[in-house]
Amino acid sequence: MDWGLTYPAHIHSWKWVSYGEPKGFSHYMPYDTHMIGSDIYQTLALVLEHTKKMKVGPGITNPRSRIAPVTANSMATLNEIGPGRAILGISTGNTARRAMGFPASKVDEVRECVEICRKLFKGEEAPYDEGPDRWMKEHRHRYVKFLNPEGGFYNLKDHIPIYVAASGPNMLELAGEIGDGVILFGAIGESFLNYCMEHIKIGAKKAGKDPKKLYILVMTAFYIPKKGETLESKEVKRAVGPFVASSLNLTALALVNTETKKMATAKGEALPADVRKGIMSFSDAYAVEEMGMERRHLKLYSEYLLGWKEEHDPLVTPEMIKTSTLTGSAEEIRDTIHRMESQGVNQVMIQPILDPNQTIDSFHENVISKY
C-alpha cells in the first residue's frame, strides 16, 4: 500500500509534505481549486524542490479552467524539475468550477483533454479545437505539439501517468477506460468502494484493459477519536466532517434521475442500497439562495474542505463518516485499509483537516508503521 497526502493547494505546503516524506508518505496531489487555494503548479514545484522522491500532481485539475495544451506544458515542466515524479490528475473540476459559480466540465471534455495531453507527452502532434464562443465566431481546428523538446524546457522522456478522478457511474467508467489510474473521493465503506470498482471494471473492459493493472487511489480524511469521543462528537465532526460533506456532495451531484436524466431529481439508484439515502442527502449540502445565483458560491465555498459548517451536522452521521473516512480506533482503521487493499486499492491519500504535522505523526504512528 502506498500512502499520500492531499490538501487545497497551499504555497507553503512543502513544509509539511517534506516533513511527511521520511514518515512513509510518497505522493502529494493537492486540489486545483483556484479561488480556494494557491496556484497548483507553483505549489508543486516547491514540493519537488524540497523533497527527494515525492511524486506530485494536481488532484485534480480540469479542462475548463486550464486548456489541454497548457496543462500538458505545466505537467511536462514539473517532469523536468522532478524527472519521473509527475502525475496528471484530472476530472470535471466540480469544486474548482462551482467555486466560481459555473458548472463542471462535461465527460467528453475530460476524454478529449486526456487524449491531447497523452499525445503531447509522447512528443506527437495533437488535434486541438476552439470556438465558437464569446470571442471567436467560428470553430477552429488546429494541431499543437511541444516545439522545443530538447531544450530543457520540459521533460518528455520520463512517462507522465494520467489518473482520472471520478464519483458517478459515467466518470467511473471513463476513468477505467482511459486512465492509467483512478482517483476516488471518500470510497471507504465496503459497498461504496465496490460500487466504484465495478463501474471502473466496466470501463477497463471496454478498452480491453486488465482492471487489476489500474492504479486505484482513494482520497479521504483520518481521525482517531480521543477517550470519551464518539462519532457524533463535535470534535470528530470538525476533524473529518468537511471531507465527508465535500466527497459525498460530489458523489450525489454526479448522479442523475434514471427516468428524467436530470441531476435535480436524482434518487441515487446506482448507489448501493445501504448507503444510498445517506449519500443523496448531501445533494443540497452546498445550496443557499439568499445571495442569488451571481454571488451565492462566494459564501458556499468559503472554508471549503477546511472548516466545519454547522449546517452539515444533521448530514454527517456516524454511518456517513464510516462510509467516507478512516475514523475509528487504530486497529479498525488498519483493518479497513487491509480490506480496501483486497478490493483493489493501491493507495490511501489523507487530507489533514486539523494540524497537518499532527495528522502526519498520528497516521504514521498508528497506521503506516504497523501496517
Language-model segment annotations:
Residues 1-59, 160, 353:
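N-terminal beta1-alpha1-beta2 module of alpha/beta enzyme domains
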Residues 1-11, 61-69, 156-167, 222-225, ...:
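Active-site mouth loops of central-metabolism enzymes
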Residues 3-7, 28-30, 56-59, 86-90, ...:
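Hydrophobic faces of well-ordered beta-strands that scaffold small-molecule active sites
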Residues 20-22, 44-55, 75-86, 176, ...:
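Acidic (Asp/Glu)-rich catalytic clusters
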Residues 41-61, 65, 113-116, 120, ...:
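Alpha-helix-loop-beta-strand connector modules within alpha/beta enzyme cores
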Residues 47, 78, 117, 175, ...:
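Conserved, mostly hydrophobic/aromatic
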Residues 108-152, 193-339:
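An alpha-helical appendage that flanks or caps ligand/catalytic pockets
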